[in-house]
């Protein structure tokens, strides 16, 4: 915004925080009107891009506060219900204001207000994006509207991608190597591009997405993990994005920014537009795409039957737990997405076309059978989703629960101490969980080699299920038949263990469990 409008705009050529007041909304609506009506008939206009990497906002702003109070009233109906859930003493919803403890609580801080706050963050972001898109469409219904989230892996709980189908025509995302791909080791950045692409494709309307920002050149000071992609990097990442279904790849940036942060960094070309190894490989890929346009214009990824489920509920619990800086080093705020990516890489390496879907967005009720759904270290599972999982399995599908899946509900209530809501589904319950300082060897029935699991040694007791795996002290895995389908429950953290030794053992497990699905693919690796 203009510097004269607000103190926060002074000295800032770029500002991508969400709206902070009703007064700003009025001015923003007028800005959108003038901008859209001026450019909507310009032949150079292809799309409207709503904010750059939107996520941040002032939690104490008048607009955020008002929306928070409305959100709490809609969720709890009475202030007494809020007080009971949050351990608070409000007398009116108007007293609810942002509390920093929701994000940086001490060791014993109650989880419910923290989880609710992160849910509100998600919904407030969605509200802002919808407001902007609706105002654009008041004046232009011909051009597509898109957006580009940042840090899709780490911030998937904030981006309600399934809900965005009602807002955007196509999705995008920033995929900068020095920022968004660094959750995986350097030699696995291609898998990171594929993973972000699958998350976008799984949620986007009819799977439409772009790689809307791809790092084009060198970092000096502007990368979390500074690097310079070479021609082979760009070729791998671009073809990976296209192979995952991306309809467009946009560099940040083609040429260099002249002044300020990022000046002299990120460019595909040289400082005076000289050709580089990066620009040459880009030109060659463009020629290939043009030469084979008949194929690429209609090509799309094959729709597989194996799906990894992403749980925003789990990510919110880990955000509540992580600030304590206690416990196992690896089970931090990114533990769930890291475990999911271990499975993703293992499946990709064997040529399995695997989808990634949000837990609540997966089509549990589809009449298609023979599907496989994988829950990786999904520690927070709402009770409301479990009956849908049971019907999914009973209809003739398979569910694999690995790691500490189901250890809590979505509000950090431990599920193992009373009635385990997933017991009918998984065929038993966990009786104990013991920490070990080293990897634990477990043997799954039917596999020739042991699997290595991270730190925790689980002990399980079968009810309707049968033992499917053991360690040196007892049963640690169950297989259960429910209706026409089955479940495999391995509460040992084998995906987390694979981060030390590679994904080969995890791939062997996956191959044994999804063999019929692999055989149905038109192509796979031997």
Please state what every model-predicted region is.
Residues 366-379:
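Short, well-ordered secondary-structure micro-motifs within conserved domains or adaptor modules
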Residues 146-149, 154-342, 432-448, 453-455, ...:
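Hydrophobic targeting/anchoring helices
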Residues 1, 46-55, 149-153, 213-216, ...:
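Short, solvent-exposed turn/loop segments enriched in Gly/Ser/Thr/Pro and often Arg
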Residues 3-193, 199:
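Polysaccharide-binding and catalytic clefts of secreted carbohydrate-active enzymes
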Residues 376-526:
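A conserved amphipathic helix/loop scaffold
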Residues 1, 159, 220, 260, ...:
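Glycine-rich, charge-decorated loop segments at or immediately adjacent to ligand/cofactor-binding or catalytic sites
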Residues 344-366:
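A short, well-structured beta->alpha microelement
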Residues 141-143, 204-208, 394-398, 485:
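A short helix->loop->beta-strand "cap" motif at the edges of active sites that frequently abuts
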């Amino acid at each position: 915004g203009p510097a004269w409008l607000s103190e926060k705009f002074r000295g800032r050529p770029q500002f991508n925080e969400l709206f902070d007041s009703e007064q700003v909304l009025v001015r923003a609506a007028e800005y959108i009107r003038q901008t859209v009506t001026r450019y909507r008939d310009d032949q150079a206009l292809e799309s409207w891009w709503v904010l750059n990497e939107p996520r941040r906002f002032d939690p104490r702003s008048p607009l955020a506060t008002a929306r928070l109070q409305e959100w709490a009233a809609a969720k709890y109906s009475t202030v007494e219900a809020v007080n009971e859930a949050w351990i608070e003493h409000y007398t009116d919803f108007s007293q609810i204001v942002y509390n920093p403890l929701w994000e940086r609580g001490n060791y014993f801080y109650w989880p419910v207000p923290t989880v609710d706050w992160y849910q509100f963050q998600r919904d407030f972001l969605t509200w802002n994006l919808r407001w902007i898109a609706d105002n654009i469409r008041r004046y232009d219904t011909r051009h597509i509207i898109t957006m580009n989230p940042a840090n899709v892996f780490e911030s998937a709980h904030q981006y309600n991608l399934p809900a965005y189908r009602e807002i955007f025509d196509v999705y995008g995302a920033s995929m900068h190597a020095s920022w968004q791909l660094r959750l995986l080791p350097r030699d696995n950045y291609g898998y990171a591009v594929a993973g972000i692409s699958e998350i976008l494709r799984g949620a986007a309307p009819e799977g439409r997405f772009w790689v809307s920002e791809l790092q084009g050149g060198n970092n000096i000071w502007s990368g979390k993990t500074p690097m310079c992609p070479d021609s082979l990097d760009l070729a791998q990442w671009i073809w990976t994005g296209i192979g995952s279904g991306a309809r467009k790849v946009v560099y940040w940036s083609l040429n260099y920014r002249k002044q300020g942060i990022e000046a002299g960094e990120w460019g595909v070309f040289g400082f005076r537009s000289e050709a580089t190894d990066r620009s040459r490989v880009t030109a060659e890929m463009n020629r290939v795409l043009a030469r084979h346009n008949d194929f690429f214009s209609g090509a799309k990824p094959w729709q597989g039957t194996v799906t990894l489920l992403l749980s925003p509920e789990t990510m919110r619990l880990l955000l509540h737990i992580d600030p304590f800086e206690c416990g196992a080093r690896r089970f931090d705020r990114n533990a769930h997405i890291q475990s999911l990516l271990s499975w993703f890489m293992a499946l990709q390496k064997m040529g399995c076309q695997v989808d990634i879907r949000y837990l609540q967005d997966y089509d549990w009720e589809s009449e298609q059978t023979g599907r496989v759904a994988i829950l990786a270290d999904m520690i927070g599972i709402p009770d409301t989703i479990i009956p849908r999982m049971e019907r999914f399995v009973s209809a003739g599908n398979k569910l694999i629960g690995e790691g500490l899946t189901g250890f809590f509900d979505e509000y950090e209530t431990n599920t193992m101490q009373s009635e385990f809501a997933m017991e009918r589904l998984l065929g038993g319950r966990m009786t104990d969980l013991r920490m070990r300082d080293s990897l634990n060897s477990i043997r799954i029935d039917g596999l020739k080699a042991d699997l290595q699991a991270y730190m925790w040694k689980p002990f399980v007791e079968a009810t309707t299920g049968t033992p499917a795996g053991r360690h040196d002290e007892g049963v640690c895995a169950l297989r259960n038949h429910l209706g026409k389908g089955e479940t495999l429950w391995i509460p040992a953290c084998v995906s987390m263990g694979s981060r030390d030794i590679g994904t080969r053992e995890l791939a062997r497990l996956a191959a044994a469990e999804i063999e019929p699905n692999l055989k149905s693919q038109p192509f796979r690796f031997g």
